[in-house]
Regions:
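Residue-level detector of intrinsically disordered/flexible regions characterized by low predicted structural confidence
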Residues: 4-5, 67
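Positively charged n-region of N-terminal signal peptides that target proteins for export
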Residues: 1-4, 110
Length: 181
């Protein structure tokens, strides 16, 4: 009797640790996976191409060009200049323009996803990871998840990272433009 019970228990333990084979993947968050796939189908082809964003205000000038490829890679260039308002002899003047170290060309990867990378509410993200092409710049050009609004034939609407419009969004325009400064 004891032998039968032990044999039965061992058989149950062996069955519990044996895997059932399935060709279907198991997702930790099926909803996020399905919405990510839908997001990529709907907007992935629209994002592929070259986009630019230009912002010129009194104390800073910013230009960025991003070229997204359908293999999930992208290249970019950024030009960023600032100047300070100083008082000389009681009068305010701007200093000359200084190019920030964050300027330069970079290469990396991109992806669209639906998730909550920082906790909280899930939403659509454009994930960007890129290193500067200049090896002397020892930091990333991008390593972030930007909230993704939409893309169409003319506009890529994403949360601004370095620079943005007053509403917090950056509206990149399609096309291969050059910096005006």
């Amino acid at each position: 009797m004891k032998k039968t019970i032990i044999t039965t228990l061992l058989a149950l333990v062996a069955m519990a640790f044996s895997s059932c084979s399935s060709d279907e993947p198991h997702w930790a968050d099926l909803e996020a996976h399905e919405k990510t796939e839908q997001l990529r189908r709907q907007y992935g082809p629209l994002i592929v191409g070259t986009w630019h964003y230009d912002k010129d205000v009194e104390n800073q000038r910013f230009f960025e060009k991003l070229s997204f490829k359908d293999d999930g890679t992208f290249t970019g260039m950024r030009k960023w200049q600032t100047r300070q308002l100083v008082t000389v002899n009681g009068e305010q003047h701007y200093t000359g323009w200084e190019t920030l170290e964050l300027s330069g060309t970079f290469t990396g990867t991109w992806s669209l996803s639906y998730w909550a990378p920082y906790g909280g509410e899930k939403r659509n993200y454009l994930e960007l990871t890129a290193k500067y092409d200049n090896e002397d710049l020892n930091y990333m050009a991008y390593s972030t998840c930007l909230t993704f609004g939409y893309a169409n034939e003319t506009t890529l609407h994403i949360q601004g990272y370095y620079v943005h419009d007053d509403d917090g969004w950056a509206n990149y325009q399609r096309g291969d433009a050059e910096s005006s400064f």
